Amino acid sequence: MDGSTAAIILTLIVTYIIWFVSLRRSYKGPRVWPLVGSLPALITNAHRMHDFIADNLRMCGGTYQTCIFPIPFLAKKQGHVTVTCDPKNLEHILKTRFDNYPKGPSWQSVFHDLLGDGIFNSDGDTWRFQRKTAALEFTTRTLRQAMARWVDRAIKNRLVPILESARSRAEPIDLQDVLLRLTFDNICGLTFGKDPRTLSPEFPENGFAVAFDGATEATLQRFIMPEFIWKIRKWLRLGLEDDMSRSISHVDNYLSEIINTRKLELLGQQQDESRHDDLLSRFMKKKESYSDKYLKYVALNFILAGRDTSSVAMSWFFWLVSLNPRVEEKIINEICTILIKTRDTNVSKWTDEPLTFDEIDQLVYLKAALSETLRLYPSVPEDSKFVVANDVLPDGTFVPSGSNVTYSIYSVGRMKFIWGEDCLEFKPERWLEESRDEKCNQYKFVAFNAGPRICLGKDLAYLQMKSITASILLRHRLTVAPGHRVEQKMSLTLFMKFGLKMDVHKRDLTLPVEKVVNEMRKK
């Protein structure tokens, strides 16, 4: 190497160091290293990523910025990440400047093979059209009635017998797996009117469910590697990308068969419009003519949204309730109070039929406990947006175009400046305080998203969760199996890494009923 070459290399190194030192001064949060940025900290804390993000946000006052590619021309674009949990910033991103913060090209590229241009993977006019169409369906009472039928049937014919069997055998049961199967069957029934029956005593494997899980897992794997790498793996059909191709093919064939069958059924069913009230049939009955491809993406988008989120939330709910007997007692008392009014004091008849709409609606404390669960353990703990144009967040943070903003839903519920000194306590009562101004505080609780993209199925989710949790708690007392570890799985959805093994005990309602009756007499 001659002297001039060495001088050029040395000059480049010195120039980079000066540039990097200047760059690093602008960041707070995890340490940024030359060339590799904050990746070492992210890798070291991968097993506790959500708490790691929350720790950094706590130290930085609710917002920090970091760099994962400290390379000139990339550092302030693709390599630049803004992380926030400040409700003012969330309102700005999710509502005020909604059009400036779409899903973005990277997100859409990752999910396109599975979700296409469906409602959860699209932006702009494509999203607006689908949102408007879907919103009309989610506001109908008949869809709620359809959900209630699927849920009630599953509770009575499958969930109750399976839990009773586990109790009689004195064997722990993986409640997370049970709830995943239950909600998968329910959302498939509601979406395209077919029950895959994954929740059965034998816990069978279902081809569609296995293929859907495989495609979802492969999609999530794409998030942990650079885009060009997974695209090369896809082109070469390597590893999970090859599995994903087969899984999506299976899912595609399964849904094609359902769509073709439904078309024939709808043609021969002109007089009886009520026979098919699932979402797929509702879209097919509209005046607009939708392609089979579009209908498949409609189905897959709603299955992905409705399956894992509710089951994961209920898993964390039962774990939290098992650790907080005071909360469990208040839930039981509330259920007993309502059933005494609607079904008298004959407890043996309380479990003959699932709870009705009116009974479910009166479970205010149970809903508060579910909301409190979602505050601490949101089903989707982190979400991100792409920045279209340079912007300044309400807290003064500058965000450059081409960069990404991550809003930590998990962290929002764990900040003292948002929820007070007791923010880490499981306290359903905070949702019942009369002084709580829900309109002002809606960006303090974004488990169902917020702004124009707020979850259309929020009310259906609460209906399903309240029905299932009330039915279980009315019949059984659940405790975590001895030696079982409850740990978060690092994924886009907040699964429990080792499931939720629980012992099932018979619920004795004698004392709760006596207590409620005595209190009612005093009034």
From Swiss-Prot:
Note the SUPFAM superfamilies from the entry. Cytochrome P450
Q: In which tissues is it expressed?
A: Expressed in stems, flowers and siliques.
- Cofactor(s), names only, from the UniProt record: heme
Record localization: Membrane
Q: How does it sit in the membrane?
A: Single-pass membrane protein
State where heme binds. C455
Q: Name one GO biological process term.
A: fatty acid metabolic process
Q: Which InterPro entries match?
A: Cyt_P450, Cyt_P450_CS, Cyt_P450_E_grp-I, Cyt_P450_sf
Quick one: a GO cellular component term?
membrane
Q: What is its EC number?
A: 1.14.14.1
* Class of the enzyme per the UniProt entry, highest EC level: oxidoreductase
**Superkingdom of the source species:** Eukaryota
Name what induces it. Answer: By methyl jasmonate (MeJA) and abscisic acid (ABA). Down-regulated by salicylic acid (SA), the ethylene precursor ACC, drought, wounding and mannitol treatment, and in both etiolated and dark-adapted seedlings.
Q: Which GO terms describe its molecular function?
A: alkane 1-monooxygenase activity; heme binding; iron ion binding; oxidoreductase activity, acting on paired donors, with incorporation or reduction of molecular oxygen, reduced flavin or flavoprotein as one donor, and incorporation of one atom of oxygen
According to its UniProt entry, what is the function of this protein?
A: Catalyzes the omega-hydroxylation of various fatty acids (FA). Acts on saturated and unsaturated fatty acids with chain lengths from C12 to C18.
> Record's PANTHER family?
CYTOCHROME P450
- Which protein family is named in the record? Belongs to the cytochrome P450 family.
Name of the protein described by the UniProt record: Cytochrome P450 86A7
Which organism was this protein described from? Answer: Arabidopsis thaliana (Mouse-ear cress)
> Per UniProt, what is the name of the gene that codes for the protein in this document?
CYP86A7
